[in-house]
Each structure stands twice: as C-alpha cells, then as structure tokens.
C-alpha cells in the first residue's frame, strides 16, 4: 500500500516538492517549486539505512556503462529556465543529465545511473544555481579571485595587470606581452578567467594583435580616449574577429554626446558598462542607451541597490579610482557630475522592469568583487518591498522576479561574451560550474562551489574536530589544488588565439575555450531582461522617465543579507 506523509515531513527528508514555497535568506522574496522531476516513493538519498546502497539505489553499472561521476540528489534548481526540483548527474566536468537518479535495475523512470563509482552530493533542502559570472573585473590584485569564488562566482572576465595605474582605472590588459603574462598567471587560480584587451585605437593593427594574443574581448574606456574614431575602429575589429566590445563612455562629453556615441556604434553589438552613469559615461544621460536594440546594458554593484549611504560613499570612491585630485576644481566637478541620486534611483526600477540586463562588480575600482550576488538579491528585495509583486507573476510567489534577477549574473553575461555554450545556466551539456546554497543563507554564503564538477570551496568547520564543527567558514577544497585545479577550470580566449594554439605557445596548464557568437546578438537575446523603454533624462533635475513614466524610489536604510550574516 502507498504510504502518505505530511508535506513538512516530506520536505525535511527529501526537500521541498511541487507547490512548496520557501523564503530566500532574510529577504521578502518567496519562491515556489514549479515541478518535480523525481518520483514519489522512489527518491534516492545517501546515508545509513537510506536508499543509495548496493543493489538498492546503487546499480552495478560501471562508468563505461553510463554511471555518473557525481549525482546531486533532490536539489531545488533556481535558474532563469525555471524553479524546479531534480537530481543532477555530472560526468567529465559537465552536466550530463537533469532528471531522476537511481538504479535502473530496481527502480522505474531512472535516467541518471548511480554506480559503484558515483559520488553523491546531498541536495535535499538545498538550492542549486549556476555559478555566477562577473563581467567587469579590474584585475588589481589576485586576492580578488578568492573573495569572488567564495561568494559563488565561477567566471571572471575583465582586464588589468595588477596595481598599475592603468588597471586601477580601466579594465584593460594592454598588448600581447601583458596578455600572455596574465594568461600564464591564470593557471594558478581555481576559477574560469577571461581577459579584455585595450580597445582604444584609431587604427586596427594594435587591436588585432591583442585578440590574436588571447584577449577574449576589447574594452573602450574614457580614460584612454573613447572617441568616435576609436569606437568605430574597435567595433570593426570585433566584427571581423568575433569578440565582444565593452564601453565606458565619455563622462565629460568632450568628443560628443550620447547620441554621437550611438551614431559611432552604428547599430553594432556592444556591452555598455555601468549604464546608469555613476561608474562613468555621458553625463547625465548615458542611461538612455537601455532603449537601444544593439546595446547590452549592465550595472556595477556600488549603486545597487540605492541606499541611504550610496551617494555619500561614491565621491570618495571616484576620486581614488580615477586618479583625481581634490585640490583641482575641475577634478571635483568631474566627480560630482557622475553622482546623481535621481539616475541611481531609476536604475533599481529599470532592473526590476528587465531593462538593465547584467549586474557585475567593477572590482576595487568603484565596486566590490565579493558582493555581486548579494547585491543582486538585495536589489530584488528592495523592489519587492517598494513596487510589490510583478504584474507577470502567477501564484503566491516571486518566481518571475527571481528568474529575472538570477539571469543578470549568470546567463546574460555569458551570452553577451560568447560563453553561453559552456556556462551560465543549469542545463544539460554545460560545464558543471554550480553553487549549492542553504535557503537561509541564499545570496550571502554558498554551501558548496563546484567548478568543472569538482568541489573547489565549501563551508567547513574545524579541521581538527572529530566532526566538521562550528565555526564554519568558507575554505578552499581539493579542486582548488594541484592538477585538479588545471583540470577543473578553463581560460576563455578568442577564436583567433585558440586556432593559433595559444595554450601550447604559452605552455598553459589550464584548458582554453574559444568565445563565439558575440556579434549577432543584442538586447533581445538577454533572457528575461530584454525590455527597451524610451528613456528621457531632464538635464537640469536629472529626473528619469521611461515611456513617459517618472522613475523614482526612496533609498533603503536597512537591507537583508547584511550584517547578521557576516559575523565572521
């Protein structure tokens, strides 16, 4: 006879199932399980007296016969594709199958085979997401990578050479020599990396050599002169060599206004950094570009979300990051022109509408590398509190909003930079760059981070304890060491560099993967974040209107996922 148990008992044993709801961290965001790919009564679970034992949930099948390397059991997947429960099978560092795990010789409907060679990660009661991607990195110091990885980011893209003054201000790794050295340095780190060359030039040769050397993209930055000629030259090279271009436009409007920049771009695909403008760009109306079909607009996290302290801290940040001097009136005026509470407030709302597509950090250059994920969910919380449920929500949940916001640091930056065949979502065939969270700590502290199917960091207690005892904090794991590091992580390069054998030429120990498909995309390709409102900015009051509607909201004085989570 079938047995019946209460929902609460079931959830405590196997995790939530279809129709169950749970809160994310201490936010006001509530998700509901949309479907469950496991089978009631045939769930697999590891442990003493549990299902995954020889002849029961574990089959006799070898790896050659299809058994998985690792199975994550009963996980609640939170992804742009949906919010659902499933077992996840990993093989060769990729997601082989999402469905029902077990022993096909004793259980029905099994499409993920557990064998003697299969490791188990218990996903019951945990949330599984894709590893995050931070697409705006100043590689100022290598210690950033640890902070980023332990926050749930598994891919970092940007430029720099260390604390050189060019890197302190701009996300560029300039020239073939520096690109080669940074590609070699990447071998030391348990994270996927990609480097941006300097895109500011009026003739193509200096840009082409950087792409051939291994730059996966090119960065136009106003501190190097983002003129119409440089924009056109850079995009022409990118179109020929299939790499993305990121742009930090001309705050001072010296070489033109936002309309001139859009004319120079000429309808070609471009990723616009900190499109609100506090991080830099045409003052006061760079935010207009969110309405362009060819522009992928992103935010950096210091303005996300708008709080009581946002404006005050920005002036000091800006003076330091852009090598400005408080004793020079022009430098102070430059800084003040970029910090506008009206456009910062509008940015939150435009994210909630799906008009901004990406969130990134701007690490140590007006951004916090370990807070991309936290600030994304703080913004989603703020908008839920201030704007209520999205009109498109169904049921007593925030699933649509949650799917929209998770896309901003997973699939959308991956699409923008030609990496979505490999990363960006929990889908079969993609790299097993995955993050497991306890729901109470979601967005603040990951439980486990996997890179290429190997655990690279995790919450861990006292190594000398008889059991892993408190205090728990995030520590590197075996996947972050030795040859496992090189087998788990990859470095993304241009197709030209991949075809030229950059890995062999530089004797790289990590594998390399080529970016692809960066030029035939646009705003419409941004998952759940493709809205294109017509934006107007009042040049005197800085008020922002979208399709005629005034966009304004109040700063919050208190946020979730904050001090109560970070005692140590």
UniProtKB/Swiss-Prot annotation:
Cofactor note: Binds 2 nickel ions per subunit.
EC number, UniProt record: 3.5.1.5
Domain Urease, first and last residues per copy: 131-568
InterPro entries from the UniProt entry: Amidohydro-rel, Metal-dep_hydrolase_composite, Metal_Hydrolase, Urease_alpha_N_dom, Urease_alpha_subunit, Urease_AS, Urease_asu, Urease_asu_c
Source superkingdom: Bacteria
A GO MF label: urease activity
Pathway: Nitrogen metabolism; urea degradation; CO(2) and NH(3) from urea (urease route): step 1/1
Family: Belongs to the metallo-dependent hydrolases superfamily. Urease alpha subunit family.
Reported modifications of this chain: Carboxylation allows a single lysine to coordinate two nickel ions.
Protein name per the record: Urease subunit alpha
Species name: Cereibacter sphaeroides (strain ATCC 17029 / ATH 2.4.9)
Oligomeric and partner information: Heterotrimer of UreA (gamma), UreB (beta) and UreC (alpha) subunits. Three heterotrimers associate to form the active enzyme.
Gene assigned in the entry: ureC
């Amino acid at each position: 006879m079938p047995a019946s148990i209460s929902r609460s008992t079931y959830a405590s044993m196997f995790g939530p199932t279809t129709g169950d709801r749970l809160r994310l961290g201490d936010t006001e965001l509530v998700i509901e399980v949309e479907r469950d790919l496991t089978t009631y009564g045939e769930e697999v679970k590891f442990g003493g007296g549990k299902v995954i034992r020889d002849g029961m949930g574990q089959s006799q099948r070898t790896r050659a016969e299809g058994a998985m390397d690792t199975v994550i059991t009963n996980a609640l997947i939170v992804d742009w594709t949906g919010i659902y429960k499933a077992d996840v099978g990993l093989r060769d560092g990729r997601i082989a199958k999402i469905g029902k795990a077990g022993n096909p010789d004793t259980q029905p409907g099994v499409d993920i085979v557990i064998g003697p060679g299969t490791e188990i990660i218990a996903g019951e009661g945990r949330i599984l997401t894709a590893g995050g991607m931070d697409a705006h990195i100043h590689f100022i110091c290598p210690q950033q990578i640890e902070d980023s990885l332990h926050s749930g980011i598994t891919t970092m893209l940007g430029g720099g050479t260390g604390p050189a003054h060019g890197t302190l201000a701009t996300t560029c790794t300039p020239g073939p020599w520096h690109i080669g050295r940074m590609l070699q340095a990447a071998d030391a780190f348990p994270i996927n990396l990609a480097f941006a060359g300097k895109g500011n030039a009026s003739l193509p040769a200096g840009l082409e050599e950087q792409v051939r050397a291994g730059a996966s993209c090119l960065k136009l930055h106003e501190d190097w002169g983002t003129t119409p000629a440089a924009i056109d030259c850079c995009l022409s090279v990118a179109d020929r060599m299939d790499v993305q271009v990121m742009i930090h436009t001309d705050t001072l409007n010296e070489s033109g206004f936002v309309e001139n920049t859009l004319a120079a771009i000429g309808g070609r695909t471009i990723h616009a950094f900190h499109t609100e403008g506090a991080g830099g760009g045409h003052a006061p109306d760079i935010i207009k570009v969110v309405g362009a079909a060819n522009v992928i607009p992103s935010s950096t996290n210091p303005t996300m979300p708008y709080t009581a302290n946002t404006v005050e801290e920005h002036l000091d940040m800006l003076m330091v990051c852009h090598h400005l001097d408080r004793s020079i009136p022009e430098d102070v005026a430059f800084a003040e022109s970029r910090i506008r509470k009206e456009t910062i407030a509008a940015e939150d709302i435009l994210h909630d509408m799906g008009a901004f597509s990406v969130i990134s950090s701007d690490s140590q250059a007006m951004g916090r590398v370990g807070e991309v994920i936290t600030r994304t969910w703080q913004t989603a919380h703020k908008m839920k509190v201030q704007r209520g449920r999205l009109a498109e929500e169904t049921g007593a949940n925030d699933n649509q909003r949650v799917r929209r916001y998770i896309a901003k640091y997973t699939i959308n930056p991956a699409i923008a930079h030609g990496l979505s065949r490999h990363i960006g979502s929990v889908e079969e065939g993609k790299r097993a760059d995955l993050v497991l969270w306890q729901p109470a700590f979601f967005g603040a502290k990951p439980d486990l981070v996997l890179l290429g199917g190997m655990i690279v960091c995790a919450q861990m207690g006292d190594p000398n304890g008889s059991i892993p005892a408190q205090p728990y904090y995030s520590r590197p794991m075996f996947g972050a060491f030795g040859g496992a590091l090189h087998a788990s992580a990859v470095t993304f390069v241009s197709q030209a560099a991949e075809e030229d054998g950059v890995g062999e030429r530089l004797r790289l120990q990590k594998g390399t993967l080529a970016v692809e498909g960066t030029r035939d995309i646009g705003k419409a390709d941004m998952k759940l974040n493709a809205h294109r409102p017509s934006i107007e900015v009042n040049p005197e009051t800085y008020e922002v209107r979208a399709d005629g509607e005034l966009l304004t909201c109040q700063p919050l004085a208190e946020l979730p996922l904050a001090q109560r989570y970070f005692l140590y």
